[in-house]
Amino acid sequence: LFIDDVYNDKKIFKDNVIPRELVFNSPYYLKECDGFSPKHKAWSNISGIDLIRNIKGDFLVLEDNLRVPSGISYMLENRMVMRDVFPELFTRYKVSDIHQYPNKLYNCMLECIPKKTKDPHMCVLTPGRANSAYFEHRFLSEQMGIALVEGKDLFVEKDIVYMKTVRGKLKVDCIYRRLDDTFLDPKAFFKGSLIGVPGLF
């Protein structure tokens, strides 16, 4: 609600809850999003919340990452190895199961696509092999059974996103993007971006 209000009605400023300058001077405020509202006003479908436990045993939030959270693939891989090596710990301590994460992510992406869409196509958009989280991008795309693409693999034609394939262009219905906002679309944001998709925003 906060982000949608900031980019649309701006009631939080009109009601003097917080000063405009606090938001508008932030390096993360994107003036290009002014007047924009995503489907269901869901500005963040996925968030990475880092928790720590203090000496009293309380859980505290160390960091919120709403832009491009990463690390889930390492946690999933680590959990698989730990379950194989120390199965008794999982039984004794009733460790929560997390292996359904790729399925839940897949379903989250499906929810972003209109129900009437037949045979929807989805993909994971990666900055490329040089990115530190490339392993995760590849891991998630494989686990979900969807394409892993780079910006050069996509193009926009008449406001529709297409993927280049050996059989020609393929309409893309949902993208799980793993690159920062500013690099997403060189027409809308950082003009020098070589990893984004012109016209995607």
What are these regions (language model features)?
Residues 1-201:
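Domain-scale recognition of functional cores that engage charged ligands
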